[in-house]
């Protein structure tokens, strides 16, 4: 079964109403203004849904008409609420749009959301007691995302490769410049200018082959990196992922986690 509305159910159940019936004292919110006005000390359950489907990319968040809090904002408010529980708490925070940015071959969006994820981690560190709070940071998989060439120090990470000792663009054997960042597969090169929603790439055909990037601004939000193999969507990779931890028991967590 399918529905023309994203996130709509086809069995006629309204889970929001069901939740409100179970928790009549609970607070349901779906926009920034309600989020900002939350009473974090009431102890009432909170159910927050800010989008029909996925949250927006961090770079695209300002285009949400109803307003959408950032990952770090949600982390801070959630910790304030959970901290009222004398028995402690478990909180899982996921920055899922990093994954989606990579699938779209949009390093700009993937890295912008990674920066916001870093802010959320720092928010968790700043708003918890290190003596009794274990914080673990990891990933569930990697992506076929590479750093290529030998760009000189200071070269923009989203830019085209300029080799050490020169001011000229480095070029492949095909005579075309290339970016520091690229993907093994995916929809490949697209230039959408200042577009901040990486998912726009799925409304076009995957790009085949190389593109002449000489006069393309590869640092713009709407630039999608080249891919060696054209696919509708970039794939996950197979390398182990890093695991970081701080707090009680952190000494038991180190190194990498094997992907399954």
Where are these regions (language model features)?
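A post-motif C-terminal structural segment
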Residues: 1-260
């Amino acid at each position: 079964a399918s529905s023309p509305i994203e996130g709509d159910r086809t069995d006629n159940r309204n889970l929001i109403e069901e939740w409100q019936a179970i928790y009549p004292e609970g607070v349901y919110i779906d926009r920034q203004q309600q989020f900002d006005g939350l009473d974090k000390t009431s102890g009432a359950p909170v159910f927050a849904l800010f989008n029909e489907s996925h949250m927006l990319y961090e770079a695209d968040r300002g285009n949400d008409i109803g307003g959408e809090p950032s990952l770090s904002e949600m982390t801070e408010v959630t910790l304030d609420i959970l901290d009222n529980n004398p028995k402690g708490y478990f909180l899982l925070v996921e920055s899922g749009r990093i994954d989606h940015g990579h699938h779209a071959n949009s390093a700009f969006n993937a890295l912008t959301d990674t920066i916001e994820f870093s802010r959320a981690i720092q928010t968790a560190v700043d708003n918890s007691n290190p003596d009794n709070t274990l914080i673990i940071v990891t990933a569930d998989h990697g992506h076929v995302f590479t750093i290529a060439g030998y760009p000189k120090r200071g070269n923009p990470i989203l830019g085209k490769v300029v080799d050490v000792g020169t001011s000229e663009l480095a070029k492949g054997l095909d005579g075309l410049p290339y970016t520091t960042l690229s993907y093994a597969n995916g929809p490949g090169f697209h230039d959408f200018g200042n577009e901040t929603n990486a998912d726009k790439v799925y409304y076009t055909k995957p790009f085949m082959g190389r593109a002449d990037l000489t006069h393309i601004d590869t640092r713009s939000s709407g630039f999608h990196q080249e891919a060696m193999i054209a696919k509708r969507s970039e794939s996950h990779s197979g390398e182990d992922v890093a695991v970081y931890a701080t707090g009680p028991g952190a000494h038991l967590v180190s190194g990498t986690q094997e992907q399954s």
